Swiss-Prot record:
Binding site for S-adenosyl-L-methionine: P225, G301, G302, D303, I306, T331, A332, M383, G412
Record HAMAP family: Siroheme_synth
Naturally occurring in which organism (per UniProt): Pseudomonas savastanoi pv. phaseolicola (strain 1448A / Race 6) (Pseudomonas syringae pv. phaseolicola (strain 1448A / Race 6))
Region (Uroporphyrinogen-III C-methyltransferase): 216-464
InterPro entries cross-referenced by the UniProt entry: 4pyrrol_Mease, 4pyrrol_Methylase_sf, 4pyrrole_Mease_sub1, 4pyrrole_Mease_sub2, CobA/CysG_C, NAD(P)-bd_dom_sf, Siro_Cobalamin_biosynth, Sirohaem_synt_dimer_dom_sf
Alphabetized NCBIfam families for the sequence: cobA_cysG_Cterm, cysG_Nterm, PRK06136.1, PRK10637.1
Active site feature: D248 (proton acceptor), K270 (proton donor)
Top-level lineage group: Bacteria
Protein's name according to its UniProt entry: Siroheme synthase
Length: 464
């Protein structure tokens, strides 16, 4: 190990930065974030750096570097493009035994800056010893995606009760076991879900020796329209810690594969007019599994609150006092339209958009057709394939032009995506000609014309 990682408390201490340009600004921001007082020396100092110095309560010296500039400083940074000057700053700092960093010159440094993941008070540093800084930044980027921002709040919660726990458990091993249980259980789950008050209540109860609640938790997770890359970080994290996963027909296998490998998987998919599992039974199943102390992911295609019946499921959970979280997903309308190259709103074509269920009941749909034919709006029909002839006929009958552009997006956002464009008049015919099947989204409006020049994603087939 060439460099020993250490964390320095610079709050209120003076740090010298030699240089007044972009590189100096970048380093100074990091130093100022740590609460240091900046002393910047350079013949010219750019405006943003000047503002930063003032905010830190520091000083600007508008001249060339002098050895006396090191007086009273606990850290020195050379951030110029003048190599001889950088070498001189390094030499002077070493003589005084003051830590020095020279940007992009590891041989002149006694300290180096790592790539930092800041979840204060939790801070993670990644360093290559100056040999491969780009690699260190890439690793940091991966860590940023894996570690939720709420981990800082979790660390803060632990800090507030650290002394109390230390008094309760004088033995180091006992304290370690206590905190490991906290960070891997319901308390951490509540804090990471943004339920800080509940997390603190559970921690206080645990310190008091109260038995932990036996009830598990339900995570209502939106899986998005199909592309696994469109999952949120939180969705992925909860999927990987679930004991049981209840999933729908619209959840792609590639997304299901991202769940914890040993999790029990229960299919509760639905098709039109045929429910594999009745909704009431799904609700009861969620309650029963949570009461067994299990962490349950209810995985739904798209967004659980947009034609996903998620509201009904969490209502049942609330009645039984089951803790739950809701993780939004990218709904099919926005995901499929984006991948089809169809903006749902556009200044020249549509100032509003409506999401509508296209399910038929007794051969018709009970919709406000007069409102749906208003100009300058986009209509997006979910589950509208079976009822498409009725939808097109009613829109035309109520005044929408038969030449209105329209599109069918089948299996949008996936490698099997197919897009067919036409008009209200011939859209049902396109379904028959191209054997279009569910899941398919219907988009109606002038914005569909933009697909001709905005299409970017190549699926299995695209017909214009």
């Amino acid at each position: 190990m060439e460099f020993l990682p250490l964390f320095h408390n610079l709050r209120g201490s003076r740090v010298l930065v030699v240089g007044g340009g972009e590189i100096a600004l970048r380093k100074s921001r990091l130093i100022a974030d740590a609460g240091a007082v900046l002393r910047v020396v350079a013949p010219e100092i750019e405006a943003q750096l000047s503002e930063l110095v003032v905010q830190s309560g520091g000083e600007m010296i508008l001249r060339g570097y002098s050895e006396s500039d090191l007086d009273g400083c606990v850290l020195i940074i050379a951030a110029t493009d003048d190599e001889p000057l950088n070498a001189q700053v390094s030499h002077d700092a070493r003589l005084r035994c003051v830590p020095v960093n020279v940007v992009d010159a590891p041989a002149l440094c006694t300290v180096i800056f790592p790539a930092i993941v800041d979840r204060s008070p939790l801070v993670i540093a990644v360093s290559s010893g100056g040999d491969a800084p780009v690699l260190a930044r890439l690793i940091r980027a991966k860590l940023e995606t894996w570690i939720p921002s709420t981990y800082g709040q979790l660390a803060g919660l632990a800090a507030r009760f650290r002394n109390q726990v230390k008094g309760l458990f004088p033995n180091v091993q006992q304290r370690r076991a206590f905190w490991e249980d906290v960070f891997q259980g319901a308390i951490a789950d509540r804090q990471l879900a943004g339920q800080g008050a509940e997390a603190e209540r559970l921690l206080i109860a645990k310190i008091a020796g109260e038995p932990p609640p036996e009830t598990g938790e339900v995570y209502l997770v939106g899986a998005g329209p199909g592309d696994p890359d469109l999952l949120t970080f939180r969705a992925l994290r909860l999927m990987q810690q679930a004991d049981v996963v209840l999933y729908d027909r619209l959840v792609a296998p590639t997304i299901l594969d991202l769940c914890r490998r040993d999790a029990e998987r229960v299919y509760v998919g639905k098709r039109r007019a045929e429910h594999a599992v009745p909704q009431e039974q799904i609700n009861q199943q969620l309650v029963a599994l949570a009461k067994q102390g299990k962490r349950v992911v209810r995985l739904k295609g798209g967004d659980p609150f947009i034609f996903g019946r998620g509201g009904e499921e969490i209502e049942e959970l609330a009645v039984h006092g089951i803790p739950f979280q809701v993780v939004p997903g990218i709904t099919a309308a926005s995901g499929c339209a984006a991948y089809a190259g169809i903006p749902l709103t556009h200044r020249d074509h549509a100032q509003s958009v409506r999401f509508i269920t296209g399910h038929l009941k007794d051969g018709t749909t009970d919709l406000p057709w007069s409102d749906l034919v208003a100009p300058a709006q986009t209509l997006v029909f979910y589950m509208g394939l079976i009822g498409l002839p009725v939808i097109c006929e009613e829109l035309i009958r109520h005044g929408r032009s038969a030449d209105t552009p329209a599109a069918l997006v089948q299996q949008g956002t996936t490698v099997n995506q197919r897009v067919f464009t036409g008009t209200l008049a011939n859209l049902p015919q396109l379904v028959a000609e191209h054997e279009v099947h569910a899941p398919t989204l219907v988009i109606i409006g002038e914005v569909v014309k933009l697909r001709e020049k905005l299409a970017w994603f190549e699926g299995a087939q695209a017909t214009v």
